[in-house]
Amino acid sequence: MKFVDEAPIFVHAGKGGNGCMSFRREKFIEKGGPDGGDGGDGGSVYLEADENLNTLVDYRYQRSFRAQSGEGGRGRNCTGAKGEDLILPVPVGTSVIDMETEEVIGDLTKAGDRLLVAQGGFHGLGNARFKSSVNRAPRQTKPGSEGEDRQIKLELKVLADVGMLGLPNAGKSTFIRSVSSAEPKVADYPFTTLVPSLGVVKVQTHRSFVVADIPGLIEGASDGAGLGIRFLKHLTRCRILIHLVDVNPIDESSPVESARAIVDEINKFSPTLAQRERWLVLNKCDTLSEDEVAEVERQIREALNWVGPIYKIAAISNTGTAQLCEKLLGHLEVLWQKERDNEELAEQEHEVQLQMQQEARERIALLQQRHRAAKAAAKGRALDNDDDDEDDDHEMEIHYVP
């Protein structure tokens, strides 16, 4: 199934039913009085997180959704039926944004979470509501109010604890295949990974974490080059980022420059994401001698001013991967426990995630704006060239041969 992580849609809540104007008419009962009932409330529109979904592709083909309107009231004080609510299923991890105000309406991060996105209209009032001691036969009713209309954007961000960063062919997908049951495509050419993939890493029974792989970044990604920039937003929910560096690239490029390029692109994309806890992992260490690996490690430390630990693995042969996953899970469990014990810390983490997501949206919107401007300029140049050709046709000389 095609992976779609963004979808703009229109939602329309149902209109409230109108109130009824009616008077009681029965044999032997004179001046029976008003008995017009109220209308029914309009249906509302909700989004509900469904753990069985993993893409927003269905919302690419249908963009408008409308809840049922309430029925009008009837005589004998009968109230109209309420309009049925419309519940739209979305994947877990979906953020909802009001496209008019650019305000984040809410996040659906757990299966079963439900979010109101369009409130149904209020029911109208029948003429029985307006009866009083001075107005025994009111001919006044109140119509139901209109339901709320909204244009919203759905943004899916995968829910993972650990996110993978690296250039194409650094071995990110191989790492996920080696530590989990996930089977992302692996090949010896760049951009094998085209969409994010998730893997559940089970260290022990009932002890696990989720790792996410996104398409590789290249130099200039923050300016729109390559595939990875639009998927970086999926890392905003990750607690730890793994920066995977190929110590022996097949194209003979410098591992030091590769590591520096990723750091630069992250800084340009989102300063807050760049401050996220990041673990540096050297991959394919089995292709070099210990002294050569040590030299690469020394150069990377100097180039990045790296003071933390550097882990050395060979994902294809599972060398060092089990120890790395054990340390990752142990650290994650400490972070999770701190947030459970300290609500203020959990709230700070939530604010940091919101800030990263906002920066990601702004950067992607800027790149889209640049792309549209460049496309329009190219189209304009093409039209100018066509006009020049037409002018040349009008100015060409015609010679008649006698």
Swiss-Prot record:
Task: Please list the residues that bind GTP.
Answer: 166-173, 191-195, 213-216, 283-286, 314-316
In what ranges is there compositional bias, type Acidic residues?
385-395
Where do the annotations place Mg(2+) binding? S173, T193
GO molecular function (one): magnesium ion binding
Give the quaternary structure: Monomer.
Q: Which family would the database say this protein is a member of? A: Belongs to the TRAFAC class OBG-HflX-like GTPase superfamily. OBG GTPase family.
Q: What is this protein called?
A: GTPase Obg
Top-down, what is the taxonomic lineage of the species of origin? Bacteria, Pseudomonadati, Pseudomonadota, Gammaproteobacteria, Cellvibrionales
- Protein encoded by which gene: obg
